[in-house]
Amino acid sequence: MKRISAFALPAILFSAVIVAAVAPRSEAQILPPLATQPGQTVTSPQSPAMKNFTPVTDEMLRNPSPNDWLMYSRTYDAFRDSPLNQINTKTVKNLRMAWVRDLEDGVTETIPIVHDGIMYVIAPGGYVDALDATNGDFIWEYRRAFKNPGIATNERTKALAIYKDMVYFTAADGYVVALDARTGKVRWETLKGETQNTSGAIVVDGNVISGGTCGKGSDSCFIEADNADTGERVWRFFTVAHPGDPGFASWNQDDNSQSMTSTWGLPGTFDAKRDVLYYGVANPMPDNRMARHNGNPDGTGRVSPADLYSNCTLALDPKTGKLIWYYQHLPGDDWDTDHTHERTLARVAFNPNPKYVKWINSTVPRGSVHDIAAMVAEGGTIFVLDRNNGQFLWATPFPYDDPNYIMSDIDVKTGQTKLNWDLVFKQPGDRHITCYWNTRSYWPTAYHEANESLFVPFIDNCRDNQIAGPGVKPGWKVIPRPGSDPNKLTGLAKVNLSTGEQLRFDLGRAPGNGAMLTTAGGLVFHGDMSRRFRAFDVNTGEKLWEAILGGNISVSTITYAVNGKQYVCVMTGFNLKVPELAAEVPDMHTPTNHNSIYVFALP
């Protein structure tokens, strides 16, 4: 077990732009990791914080208390925009650390949830902790003994879910586990299959809905709904179109049973008014076209649809799993450019500005108001669709346009997408630079409804790829975009979803894999690989506050309130992308295994 509590409070620096202030030791608690054994649940004999627990209802999930954070992005629409405003542009300079809790070594890509003053969080090793959200005190811990250790190679679950009096944990060994929210005892568990649960879950109308990686072959690639009370399977939607499915022809194969495309990333979103579930799907596998299509790069289409339902937005009936519509963002992917992660469900007027937006649907009336599903791809495109029917509204390369950009065109009237054929691997040993590579990934965006803006962390990364050939070993490496400014490798973008206009701020060299968070206090929070956790003005991007933590910020960022006091929580630690990101800035010497929870509040 690592030992990191000795870093001491003076190592945690706070600044309001340039004025540093160190929190006195009496204002914070540094708490050690827990020590239970796999397969056990340990509960505190006295948990006064649990006395206020109330079961979570469907109405609470639809309209959560400002005090709670009940799912990975707080609300079904993935806004990550809190109505709390005690911490605001005037008071944020006084923000201090309230408590810290160390976690054990391992992978942490998770986002805590909070209900009635209790924080539930996935800890490294595939554990679930319940803590007093005001001070980090232990309530209970569940440590899973993996039943399928062969597939539980990385405990990468992104989020827990909560409903009634149960917390739902999609464990790395392919099980969905329902835990008693008060005690941590197992209420039920159900095996999804030989797939790794990397995504997390949301609960919609009494169903626990989750995705994950694929196991072996197309039958292992699906989104599943399980009854929240019993764990009984309700439905599955297979993300590789099977024979008999209208999308099967897009594979141009008699047998695609060994092809795969998963939902490994962030969970789906839900429009309660329309009763529609939206999910993003990752790239097809194997990663390149020749490997999937018997050595023929033209074995599938150059325009959408190709290899369905890879790189798609899916609109599903949450009660049955039936497909309502799909939109394919990139056909027949050749470069592992996932279009998974959250779809932001906003309502905006259609007024894209050609200065900022490359592809605009010319048939849509200017000023018309649309309920949209917006997404930012790992491969670097912002898409805005009408979520009623999947109609294409606008899209643009992100963070910049580039000759090595993987998309060559979009038919703006139909929304049909076309990949960049010049960058497709056509012969063994081919080598290409492709843009972009993980310009964002499983760290969520945030949408500030008051100014119609999506806040997105970006990395100006491309990839140098080579496939195997005679005397040539396959390989790839991440590189800055050719011609880019090395001192502006990373940053944050404020993207207006009505106009497409962008404001870039916090430009620098430190890659970020922390979640975005906006608040009614006029703030946007974000952290990066430099150990800096910052608050900015949501309108201007001006930095208002900064804390220097013990390690790189990892996903996680949330805010909540208990007894009238607002808290901001962030986690540091190791996750899948940390070695790759750290390699880009080796001179930073970022501590990559500093797994901890940090919580801040006003004095």
Give the positions of each predicted feature:
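Short loop/turn segments that connect beta-strands within beta-propeller blades
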Residues: D132-N135, D180-T183, N227-T230, P318-T320, ...
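Extracytoplasmic beta-rich repeat domains
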Residues: W99-I113, E141-A161, V186-G200, G217, ...
